[in-house]
Amino acid sequence: MSDINATRLPIWGIGCNPCVGDDVTTLLTRGEALC
């Protein structure tokens, strides 16, 4: 589930709102650090 969401969110964020895309990038970076 996490991998699927991580794949879709950046596309949605960048396509709809750069600010959201930045937030998603930060979340993905933190997620990778946790892994």
From Swiss-Prot:
Pfam families: Amanitin. The modification (3R,4R)-4,5-dihydroxyisoleucine is found at I11. One of its GO terms (molecular function) is toxin activity. There is a cross-link at W12-C16 (2'-cysteinyl-6'-hydroxytryptophan sulfoxide (Trp-Cys)). Residues 1-10, 19-35 form a propeptide. Signal peptide: none annotated. The modification 4-hydroxyproline is found at P18. The keyword Cytoplasm does not apply. InterPro entries: Amanitin/phalloidin (IPR027582). There is a cross-link at I11-P18 (Cyclopeptide (Ile-Pro)). The modification (3R,4S)-4-hydroxyisoleucine is found at I11. Processed by the macrocyclase-peptidase enzyme POPB to yield a toxic cyclic decapeptide. POPB first removes 10 residues from the N-terminus. Conformational trapping of the remaining peptide forces the enzyme to release this intermediate rather than proceed to macrocyclization. The enzyme rebinds the remaining peptide in a different conformation and catalyzes macrocyclization of the N-terminal 8 residues. Keywords: Hydroxylation, Thioether bond, Toxin. Major toxin belonging to the bicyclic octapeptides amatoxins that acts by binding non-competitively to RNA polymerase II and greatly slowing the elongation of transcripts from target promoters. The typical symptoms of amatoxin poisoning are gastro-intestinal distress beginning 6-12 hours after ingestion, a remission phase lasting 12-24 hours, and progressive loss of liver function culminating in death within 3-5 days. One of the few effective treatments is liver transplantation. This is Alpha-amanitin proprotein. It comes from Amanita bisporigera.
